[in-house]
Amino acid sequence: MPFRLLARVAAPISLALLAACASPSDRNITLAGPDASARASGSSAASVDESGVAVRPIKYARQKPGCSGTCPRIEVDSIAIESAPKLTQLIDNALAYMTGVDPDRSGNYRSLQEYEQHFWATAQARDVTQLRARVRDAYKGLITVELTTGQYLTGAAHGIPATQFLNWERDRNRVLALNEALVPGRQDQFNAALQRAHGRWKTQLEDYQRDPGAFDRMWPFQPTDNFALTRTGVVMKYDAYAIAPYASGQPEVVIPYSELTGVLDPKWLPG
């Protein structure tokens, strides 16, 4: 299959889509619930990770049933969060949603279990899907989860990666959007702080150092709303190809909290 660069490899998930993903239907929950361990033989008991959140690892690798030789494969390295079953369900549904990078191969699935059946029916021999989730940080009443997918399609030049942050408010049991984290009317100031941080970030890249003008023409700054509130700053995540060549991976630009006084809602600032 020839490689095709999509305009947005995997656009950040909107709040509306997140709400739709978080369906209350138990049939969609494949990382949570009493029978999850039976479905994911690699799961184990819950433990407290370095962020202080109790998580149960869900880890397994499978190839297409009945296939021999070179076979399509799915690898899952995810988590169930014991204290937040609704977040666990959202992780499952959002990871499935993030696989829809190719409109010719997307399907009507809303969970990893449903995606797996779709994948076996449509995948070519060397296709591999990797699905990962981890707690990035736990800060100011938030659980920040990092979702990562990698799709390696038969005949493609290289993989198609995507990352999405979920900032989960424990007290409200919902995802926090970027505009909700800001002081009302301060989006422009936030974007200006992001652009300054981006300016510092790009100076570390060899491509920029070699020819700053050419780099800026090819890879101009653009804002993103894919963010993570962490103890060290606001991490802004970009897709591959968004602001740098593929070799740069999925760039992270960190805005220090010192630049966000009067911009970020004070409840999210340190101290």
Predicted features and spans:
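Compositionally biased intrinsically disordered regions enriched in Thr/Gly
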Residues: A22-G271
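C-terminal motif of bacterial Sec signal peptides marking the signal peptidase cleavage site
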Residues: L17-A20
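Bacterial N-terminal signal peptides that target proteins for export
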Residues: M1-A11
